């Protein structure tokens, strides 16, 4: 309802006028899009093993947690390999782009079979890794509330924050590659 009690007719009985319609594409992409910067992603994935090794000695008395860390590191390594493979593929398209910000829009949103296949692999690997990171975050959350936990609270808090950063990075990674691996159906 609009001010004064005016009620709009049903949408199918309306004519829509988009002022600033030339911005509609960019606005839709910002609102519904997903992105990850490949080089930044590779940088934090490559830094992750060193960060894990720094935390491992602090948590060696917690067997469950200390067993999780090498698994998280291995999965991050596999993910790094896959994301590294994406860089040269996507760079080819960026080199074709005339967009000032170095962006490329795929015609009709179709990224092609090669990128779609790689995206599927990255999605599967990221999904599994995300699950491990969620378990790590839950374990650290429980450790924070355990007064008898053998690690000082400030160390747990620091690692909890770091794990949260990894988790949010993995979620962003998954959001993008999950969208890219799905083949568009005709008319979408």
Give residue ranges: language-model regions:
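Conserved coupling segment at the C-terminus of the helicase ATP-binding
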Residues: 2-16, 20-188
């Amino acid at each position: 309802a609009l001010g004064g009690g005016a009620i709009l007719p049903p949408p199918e009985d309306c004519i829509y006028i988009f002022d600033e319609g030339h911005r509609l594409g960019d606005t839709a992409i910002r609102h519904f899009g997903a992105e990850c910067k490949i080089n930044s992603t590779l940088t934090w994935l490559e830094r992750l093993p060193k960060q894990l090794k720094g935390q491992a000695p602090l948590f060696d008395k917690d067997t469950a947690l200390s067993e999780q860390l090498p698994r998280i590191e291995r999965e991050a390594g596999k993910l790094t390999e896959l994301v590294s493979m994406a860089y040269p593929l996507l760079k080819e398209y960026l080199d074709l782009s005339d967009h000032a910000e170095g962006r490329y829009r795929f015609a009709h949103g179709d990224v092609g079979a090669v990128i779609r296949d790689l995206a599927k692999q990255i999605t599967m690997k990221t999904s599994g890794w995300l699950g491990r990171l969620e378990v790590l975050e839950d374990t650290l959350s429980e450790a924070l509330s355990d007064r008898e936990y053998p690690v000082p609270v400030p160390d747990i808090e620091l690692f909890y924050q770091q794990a949260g950063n990894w988790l949010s990075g993995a979620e962003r990674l998954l959001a993008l590659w999950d969208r890219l691996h799905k083949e568009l159906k005709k008319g979408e």
